[in-house]
């Protein structure tokens, strides 16, 4: 069935100091383009290398961290921006930046090829979506069997005391995956029910990680039986031979759009526009589809190996305006309640 994408017009901590800065040199006269991103670090080289095949005169300098850290850094730098482009950031974060007047509007060439719910409806557009990532639960089948744990089928199952000390999930203050989880639980269960669910989940939680991929990686390595993460990370771990089962909770799963923007005031506007144009090209979209089952290019998405077949049907009708408008309050409440178990 058609996935309902409910977009509207409208991921400066010490962790950022450790963010990886990856530069891909091309020619001595290349324009240096500083690009903030929350995309997995292992995927960045192939994107830059493919881009540079067509545009060797633009040198991408990646600054990478989790969604929450990147978002906080951008907001802190609002009056003295350091990035030219943000590429691979949550839709709710981009909407906040738009409301703060931080974006340079630009409509990339070829935008007519995209689903119109994947880009800002203003003209020119302020933000454009690339793909969507979806929450899932990674279960190490060997570990749950060894510990005598039942296989969970729902979010509510994870509140059973039998799982105490066996769960790991991302901290929503640093992780976009963690925030989409919390936002989706509040939408699915209501505000009172959502916090009650998280209170019960917290009792079973071993710890909260900095990144969204870490819980699934830890489950794959056997360091925890169960990690709340996202489906692609589980699929990649399973493809590498890990004893992982990707569980799609029966109540539904949260998800987020990943997209890109140009930062207002950049001195490298033409290079930034070139990257925007390339980022919605068929070549780029085919690369995204290698790891994401949902991409913004119309009619392109193909099944991803090891993705559960029911995943897309379980994606909730997400209220991104709710997520963007309430982000600060949600994160403050979460931190007050649960931060004692964070890395």
Tell where the protein language model's regions lie, with residue ranges:
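Periplasmic-binding protein-like
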Residues: 113, 162-170, 197-202, 208-209, 240-264, 279-301, ...
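Extracellular/periplasmic bilobal clamshell ligand-binding domains
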Residues: 304-343
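Extracytoplasmic ligand-binding site segments that recognize negatively charged/polar headgroups
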Residues: 38-45, 68, 82-223
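Short, polar/charged alpha-helical segment
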Residues: 37-61, 75, 137
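A ligand-binding cleft/hinge motif common to bilobed small-molecule-binding domains
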Residues: 92-96, 220, 224-243
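A bilobed periplasmic-binding-protein/Venus flytrap-type ligand-binding module shared by bacterial periplasmic
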Residues: 138-143, 183-186, 256-268, 287-288
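N-terminal signal peptide c-region/cleavage motif recognized by signal peptidases
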Residues: 25-28
């Amino acid at each position: 069935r058609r996935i309902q994408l409910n977009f509207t017009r409208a991921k400066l901590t010490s962790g950022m100091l450790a963010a990886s800065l990856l530069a891909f040199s091309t020619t001595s006269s290349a324009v240096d383009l500083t690009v903030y991103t929350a995309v997995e670090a292992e995927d960045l080289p192939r994107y830059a290398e493919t881009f540079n095949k067509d545009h060797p005169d633009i040198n991408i300098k990646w600054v990478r961290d989790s969604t929450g850290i990147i978002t906080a850094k951008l907001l802190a730098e609002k009056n003295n921006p350091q990035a030219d482009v943000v590429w691979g950031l949550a839709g709710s974060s981009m909407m906040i930046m738009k409301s703060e007047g931080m974006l340079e509007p630009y409509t990339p060439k070829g935008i007519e090829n995209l689903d119109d719910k994947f880009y800002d409806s203003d003209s020119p557009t302020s933000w454009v979506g690339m793909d969507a990532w979806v929450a899932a639960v990674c279960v190490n089948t060997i570990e749950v069997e060894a510990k005598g744990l039942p296989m969970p089928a729902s979010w509510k199952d994870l509140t059973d005391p039998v799982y105490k000390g066996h769960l790991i999930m991302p901290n929503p203050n640093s992780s976009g995956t963690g925030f989409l989880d919390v936002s989706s639980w509040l939408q699915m269960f209501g505000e009172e029910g959502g916090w009650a669910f998280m209170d019960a989940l917290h009792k079973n939680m071993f710890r909260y990680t900095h990144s969204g991929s870490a819980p699934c990686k830890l489950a794959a390595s056997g360091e925890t039986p169960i990690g709340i993460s996202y489906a692609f990370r589980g699929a990649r771990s399973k493809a590498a031979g890990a004893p992982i089962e990707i569980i799609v909770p029966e109540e539904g799963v949260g998800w987020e759009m990943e997209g890109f923007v140009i930062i207002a005031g950049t001195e490298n506007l033409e290079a930034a526009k070139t990257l925007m144009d390339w980022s919605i090209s068929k070549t780029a979209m085919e690369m995204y589809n290698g790891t994401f089952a949902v991409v913004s290019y119309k009619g392109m998405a193909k099944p991803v190996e090891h993705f559960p077949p029911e995943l897309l049907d379980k994606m909730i009708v997400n209220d991104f305006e709710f997520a963007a408008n309430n982000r600060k309050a949600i994160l403050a409440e979460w931190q007050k309640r649960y931060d004692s178990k964070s890395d």
